[in-house]
């Protein structure tokens, strides 16, 4: 299976939500941007391992309207999120065909 990568940078350009599937394992990361210096991953959530049942068009990374939470949506369901205080974690463990267990107020 092909690799999948997607990200969304907050408007302040200080944090990004990043999804990465390397062909075997998928993670959702919270990345801290450091302007002209290399940034760092400050949080990670395991999404799944194994064969994927979706493609890059099914993935979206969205910041809420207050930019206090960044979420990973798979087929329009919120499967993982980071919220303030950074890096508070929610969700993970995607299961094909299942409904997400993440119950988080997410205002787009």
Residue ranges, per PLM feature:
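A sequence-composition feature that detects small, non-aromatic residues
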Residues: 2, 8, 16, 26, ...
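Blade-terminus and WD-like Trp-Asp/Gly-His loop motifs, strongest in beta-propeller folds
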Residues: 3-22, 62-67, 105-108
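Beta-strand C-termini and the immediately following turn/loop, strongest in propeller blades
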Residues: 18-23, 30-33, 73-75
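Signature of short aromatic-glycine-proline-rich micro-motifs recurring in repeat-based ectodomains
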Residues: 56-61
């Amino acid at each position: 299976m092909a690799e999948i990568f997607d990200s969304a940078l907050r408007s302040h350009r200080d944090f990004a939500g990043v999804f990465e599937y390397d062909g075997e394992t998928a993670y959702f990361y919270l990345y801290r941007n450091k302007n002209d210096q290399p940034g760092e991953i400050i949080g990670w959530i395991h999404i799944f391992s194994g064969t994927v049942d979706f493609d890059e068009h099914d993935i979206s990374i969205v910041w809420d309207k207050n930019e206090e939470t960044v979420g990973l949506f798979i087929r329009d369901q919120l499967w993982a999120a980071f919220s303030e205080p950074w890096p508070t974690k929610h969700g993970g463990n995607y299961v094909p065909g299942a409904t997400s267990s993440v119950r988080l107020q997410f205002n787009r």
